[in-house]
Amino acid sequence: MHELAFDAHGSMVRWLDTPGAAPARVYLHGLAGTAHAAFGEVAGHPRLAGRRTLLIDLPGHGHSDRPADWSYTLDAFAGVVAAVIEAAGLARVDLVGHSMGGCIAIVLAARRPDLVSRLVVAEANLDPLPPDPAGLGSQQMSYQAEADFVQTGFAAMQDANPGWRSTARLCDALAVHRSAVGVVTGSAPTMRELLLPLTIPRTFIRGDRGETLVGPESLLAAGVRIKEIRGAGHMMMADAPEAFVDTIASALTPEV
């Protein structure tokens, strides 16, 4: 496992780097997730294996450190991922992100176009969302006060969703709450506004039982490919793993 300091206190972001051919592929997990749980089997699948692969645990998640004075905004995450890519001696990578990881991937591709050659996002938020106790996971988390979420809310959400607990227990409650606030707040310009003018190949993946994609017409008009996975919800890598792999492999196949 590799590590790199990402703040003035020496807090470390950590990742796995497996050898393979270029272009390298970088995978970014979602909120309260980990790299190996979200993408370990995906990246090692025969249809995707053979490329150099970076599986990054984002700050506050998994094996990475979780400083209490860090912002956990999308731009802050994107800056860390950019630093990891550069530390690995890479450029023009294929970037794949799920949920919050997809938001971060969009921001990174827009801020640092020199680092990204192809972009695949799976059910990433494209627009800011209001905190909402009945909304998406990030909306429910951000609706709670930070102190309340840290003291009781994070544990309560894990108790209500035992499957989610398997990765959430490896994450820091404060970091998860601030990350959720970052997701619903979004970027400036918005993720959609950053995504549309990009000139690299872009694919947006959604599950037919997952989150509603608002404004697909704007994506299609800008040349973003939209792929739907049948029988999959938001956690498509678990619901339909073979179809998820096939969709990513197709998105990362160079067009001739």
Residue ranges, per PLM feature:
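Conserved serine/cysteine hydrolase catalytic core
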Residues: 173-230, 237
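Catalytic histidine-centered segment of alpha/beta-hydrolase-like enzymes
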Residues: 232-245
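Conserved HGGG/HGGXW glycine-rich cap/lid loop of the alpha/beta-hydrolase fold
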Residues: 9-65
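Gly/Ala-rich beta-loop-alpha elbow adjacent to hydrolase catalytic centers
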Residues: 97, 101, 105
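Glycine-rich His-Gly loop
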Residues: 27-31, 99, 207
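Active-site loop/oxyanion-hole signature of alpha/beta-hydrolase fold enzymes
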Residues: 40, 52-96, 246-249
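Conserved alpha/beta-hydrolase catalytic His-Asp/Glu region
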Residues: 130-136, 143-197
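Flexible "cap/lid" loop of the alpha/beta hydrolase fold
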Residues: 106-111, 115-148
